[in-house]
């Protein structure tokens, strides 16, 4: 997963993609807590902003009302998604790809569908027109919303670690070039697939890296999506993509020299035609990525200074707003820790290896903006992991430790940092905005509710385990997963809170 500072590449281009067929009806799904483009299903713009009576004046009245065990277990804990809440039912997927429907008020499990297919995450679900969409580590699926009955499955050629996107009768799922152990699979390409939402039939695909893999398919791989795409009102598809590999390189091909050039369309934000899958434009944040700095988060589609923009972010520690019509940069802001390595991938692409300093690099390959942002009408909120890594040579990286976390608020029109809230633990989960609060979860197992104007903490709660999952709010209730055990004896659980208990 990559991202870095460089001279970003922005272009308008057309590329070959699979044939598009058919077009379904609108897929917005409603819930009493949602208005307009509200998360998750009708939040096509990925703002992660919801309507609720919860605000700073009553948030301290949230009390835990139920919790249930999370039984599945993946490579990185048990839970890494955001639960969905539709019409009083919570829909949840664990890191073994198992799906449950749970009564929001009581915590009673209404139905479950077992897959027992371990995922690295972040995975999760989407819901539209009476169907629950998800994926195992190898195939996309649809379940009947009321019963959990499987309606269709579609095998995809590659590993899957994401929640689907759904819009206008299509389901979008991407593969990533990953081995079961979590390494990079040589010769694999991350491919975004568009499928008919009713049948699962493939309609088109877009390869986020070329089939020739820059001349060395026996070594290289790259691309793919880790989070769902976003959609504008015309249905256009916006997605953030992952890194190329190997990284930083091999002993024979240090600093990514087995894959010369910028390695399109990795570490990028892409805009695709929804009917054909053809590329409209791309913005590449980190050409020739060598540090696993994905630009992976779902772009936020919103307005900045009177024009529509798409705001992307990733593990290199930058948030970038681009014009949705052209892909041209409107503003670009760094967040979190940086220690002078933002241009190393450019140096590597140019063969200027003497300009790359080995040693401690910030952010690390699991740092930066590792999970989706949220936005309201004035600000963009970024979850930050301040984690370093040690680059030993052009072919070796040692993982660092996750030291601290932050939430930073950026001015929507300028990208200027308005405030930063610091934590003793990484902020691994996606953010959520409701009224004058932004909610975050931490790796050590806390929910934090921050005032959107100042970043001051208004309310907090200890979870039964560490968390790398987002929260969801419906009406006067909040639900989140704690599935990242950080200490012996901690148990993964899905937890619900309610105003007044």
Language-model features: locations:
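A structural motif specific to WD40 beta-propellers
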Residues: 63-65, 108-112, 149-152, 203-205, ...
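Surface-exposed loop and turn segments in beta-propeller and other repeat-based domains
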Residues: 66-74, 115-118, 203-219, 279-292, ...
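C-terminal motif of bacterial Sec signal peptides marking the signal peptidase cleavage site
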Residues: 20-22
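Repeat-blade elements of multi-bladed beta-propeller folds
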Residues: 31-42, 76-98, 117-140, 160-192, ...
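Bacterial signal peptide processing site
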Residues: 24-26
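Short loop/turn segments that connect beta-strands within beta-propeller blades
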Residues: 103-106, 144-147, 196-199, 274-276, ...
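Blade/loop signatures of beta-propeller domains
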Residues: 29-65, 396-397
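Conserved blade-ending motifs and adjacent loop-strand segments that build the rim/top face
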Residues: 289-290, 339-342, 347-356, 422-429, ...
């Amino acid at each position: 997963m990559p991202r870095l500072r460089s001279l970003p590449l922005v272009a308008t281009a057309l590329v070959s993609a699979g044939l598009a067929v058919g077009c379904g009806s609108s897929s917005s799904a409603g819930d009493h807590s949602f208005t307009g483009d509200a998360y998750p299903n009708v939040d096509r713009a990925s703002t992660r902003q919801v309507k609720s009576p919860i605000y700073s004046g009553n948030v301290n009245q949230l009390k835990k009302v139920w919790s249930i065990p999370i039984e599945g277990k993946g490579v990185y804990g048990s839970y890494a998604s955001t639960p969905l809440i539709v019409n009083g039912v919570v829909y949840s997927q664990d890191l073994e790809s198992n799906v449950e429907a749970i009564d929001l008020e009581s915590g009673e499990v209404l139905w479950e569908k077992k897959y027992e297919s371990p995922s690295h995450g972040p995975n999760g679900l989407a819901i539209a027109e009476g169907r629950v969409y998800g994926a195992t580590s190898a195939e996309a699926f649809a379940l009947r919303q009321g019963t959990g009955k499987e309606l269709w499955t579609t095998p995809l050629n590659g590993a899957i670690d994401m929640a689907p996107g759904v819009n206008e009768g299509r389901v979008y799922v991407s593969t990533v070039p990953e081995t079961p152990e979590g390494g990079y699979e040589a010769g694999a390409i991350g491919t975004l697939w568009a499928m008919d939402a009713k049948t699962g039939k493939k309609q088109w695909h877009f390869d986020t890296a070329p089939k020739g893999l820059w001349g060395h398919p026996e070594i290289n791989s790259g691309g793919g999506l880790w989070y769902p795409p976003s959609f504008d009102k015309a249905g256009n598809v916006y997605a953030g993509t992952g890194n190329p590999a190997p990284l930083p390189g091999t002993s024979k091909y240090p600093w990514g020299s087995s894959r010369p050039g910028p390695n399109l369309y990795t570490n990028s934000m892409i805009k695709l035609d929804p009917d054909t899958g053809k590329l409209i434009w791309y913005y590449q944040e980190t050409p020739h990525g060598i540090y696993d700095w994905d630009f992976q988060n779902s772009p936020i589609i919103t307005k900045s200074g009177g024009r529509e923009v798409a705001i992307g972010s990733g593990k290199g520690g930058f948030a970038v707003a681009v014009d949705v019509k052209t892909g041209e940069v409107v503003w670009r802001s760094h967040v979190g820790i940086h220690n002078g390595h933002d241009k190393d991938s450019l140096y590597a692409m140019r063969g200027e290896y003497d300009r790359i300093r080995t040693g401690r690099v910030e952010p690390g390959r699991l740092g930066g903006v590792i999970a989706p942002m949220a936005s309201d009408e004035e600000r963009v909120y970024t979850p930050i992991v301040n984690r370093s890594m040690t680059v030993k040579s052009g072919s070796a990286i040692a993982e660092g430790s996750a030291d601290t976390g932050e939430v930073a608020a950026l001015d929507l029109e300028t990208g200027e940092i308005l405030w930063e809230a610091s934590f003793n633990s990484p902020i691994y989960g996606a953010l959520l905005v409701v009224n004058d609060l932004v909610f975050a979860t931490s790796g050590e197992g806390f929910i934090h509710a921050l005032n959107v104007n100042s970043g001051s903490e208004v309310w907090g709660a200890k979870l039964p385990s560490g968390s790398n999952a987002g929260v969801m709010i419906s009406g006067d209730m909040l639900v989140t997963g704690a599935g990242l055990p950080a200490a012996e004896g901690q148990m993964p659980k899905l937890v619900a809170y309610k105003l007044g208990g």
